[in-house]
């Protein structure tokens, strides 16, 4: 090899201590292309030593060979001069005037089909299509060059260099390989046609290639950390926690079916979390929940309750948790979580299911789920689009060989019908434990056709724990204010508190639930399937059956007493009907509830109630059903690269991030510091996380209704907008109404 070929440019930077003096850090030794290639191959081989049982020999070979050749294109002279500017004079090359062809595109046309087939006797033409597509698209680049441009570029800047690098003469590029690509990242036409097996093989090769490449580029040797398959440390911790207790039926079932995909329906308080963790059996697992607050609670339970230190959490606010745990290791912990490197990851579905949109860069999630177990908690809590995303994603995971467990207190029969329709039901076991005789009857329902009885609620709150759930934030604020006039022990929790204060309130309501304290908490839907709380009495606005049963689960949760009088009061005041909840489902939920009024409402009856409301034939013409069906059909027609990584959103949440002016004024120096261009990326991330803690998300539709109270322009380089609306919160008593839309402070900062 006549010339040294490099994989990346030299790294330079400023340390925090040196920033003021602007003294450059010592340069890291530049890694050669050959060493980078060997590191990635070694990373792949080490991975297969631990996780090889999940893959066929052909799959392993495809991935390793993709790791070996994917960066060959970096040997091209233009790339080498760009990362080593001193070569420009030596080779008399002005790279600024040359349009560089992406190195992945060059790598994909360096290897001939015959060379590929010679690698392994089992390789086929379909394998070549998946393989060459993974190499070609291993970075997200537009297809802007045709075969003639590739050949011309190759003759000028690549063939001599790749021959030198490989130590074997290369006289041409195999541009016919482009005809084997499964798709192009440019304008496309017609329906995307690809055999699912070939597409899934592409997902596997591309996903693992990216995983190993990202791992090595981040400075790690191993793609997976603390593999628990042999030692089963988490399983032992859970068994230790359950020691001396008989396993509940759901727990026994999941322990006996560790190798199967499952749908387990079991009431609140039946030990579903422990059942799911036992089902993992030491294998790599992802535990998903609908909300970040519930993800945080499960993460804390696994990490602190069971003492399992290798669990991580991954969502848009996870960095804040790591900073609270240990600021010194927060950056590394977050990076490892993003690399999907830990044995147990607690997350929301938003991180995992983007691969359904076939966006470049999302293949790593499908590939990782092939050798993992996926837990989906409370699937009925998702909106129709998210449910469709989950079901379509599970179909892909099932085809690739992954396993999943849906664990839920309520499972609408329409979801089982969709699973049957799309071939999921044939490959998983269903088990319903709502008839478990050991589950006590916990609820008696009273329906009120009026607004809430505030005097009665205030009176109950003097001696009992009372939970009030409203369908909208504005109604919750209104009810809270009126109750505060009647009782001092009233708190409010909803989404219009800044994250810092909302975290305090979530901690407070958990502590309140466990204490002997009496009082009232007014909340919104955010407590439905998120917080492990237990109140004596529930007053709730009417909603759809799935949400209503979730809300009931926050009352008499542990079944300490069988109610003689009603402990669930449901108010049919129509707040949210037609806007928050589909009117048809709202009315069906109300009508079917009436026959269960003023009787002991058993878990078996709740399942019957849910089945009556969500019977497929009865709701086939509802928007709920049509949206799931339409989304499932749409996913099957999506063309690869039709969506970008930023566009591949599991949940269609359109919101902006705001900070109340009073909070902004107290923290203005953080906004100034984050603009400092000499900050290290770690410090910048830390500041951005602190800033996020001082903000809240506001739905865009809500913003449109209040156009004069929120700045249109964001602050500096952040995506945070100032709002002049009053923000009310007492950090000592943890009381206040939060952000009051439409109510401006007397003094407005401009």
State each model region's role.
Residues 364-373, 379-434:
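Post-DEXD/H (motif II) to motif III coupling segment of the RecA-like Helicase ATP-binding lobe
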Residues 282-306, 315-318, 413-415:
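Conserved Walker A/P-loop ATP-binding site and its immediately adjacent core
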Residues 2-29, 33-230:
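Accessory nucleic-acid engagement/destabilization modules that flank
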Residues 413-461:
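Interdomain hinge/linker at the junction between the two RecA-like core domains of SF2 helicases
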